[in-house]
Amino acid sequence: MAHEHGHHKMELPDYKQWKIEGTPLETIQKKLAAKGLRDPWGRNEAWRYMGGFTKSVSFFDVFFKGFKWGFAAFVVAVGAEYYLKSLNKDKKHH
């Protein structure tokens, strides 16, 4: 019996897509080369300087991350409260 549970072989990205050219890692490689050294793992860190990882995060981004959806939920909750209170005003209490 095979114990396959619908798992597929994980596909790893091609290592050649990560380039250090145009990143701060290139400067580090040049400084190391001037001393006769080389960082063979430099390319493994190149992903940090490409794509969505390069956007710097500001205090504003962190503090107001969910503000838009939170404010919308607040408005809906306040609207529901006022609506439910208006229904209660129609009922006479002794």
From Swiss-Prot:
Pfam families (UniProt xref): NDUF_B12 (PF08122)
Compartmental location: Mitochondrion inner membrane
Membrane topology category: Single-pass membrane protein
One GO term (biological process): mitochondrial respiratory chain complex I assembly
Posttranslational mods: Methylation at His residues by METTL9 enhances complex I-mediated mitochondrial respiration.
Keywords: Acetylation, Electron transport, Membrane, Methylation, Mitochondrion, Mitochondrion inner membrane, Respiratory chain, Transmembrane, Transmembrane helix, Transport
Assembly, per entry: Complex I is composed of 45 different subunits.
Family as reported in the entry's similarity comment: Belongs to the complex I NDUFB3 subunit family.
Name recorded for this polypeptide: NADH dehydrogenase [ubiquinone] 1 beta subcomplex subunit 3
Native source organism of the sequence: Pongo pygmaeus (Bornean orangutan)
UniProt gene name: NDUFB3
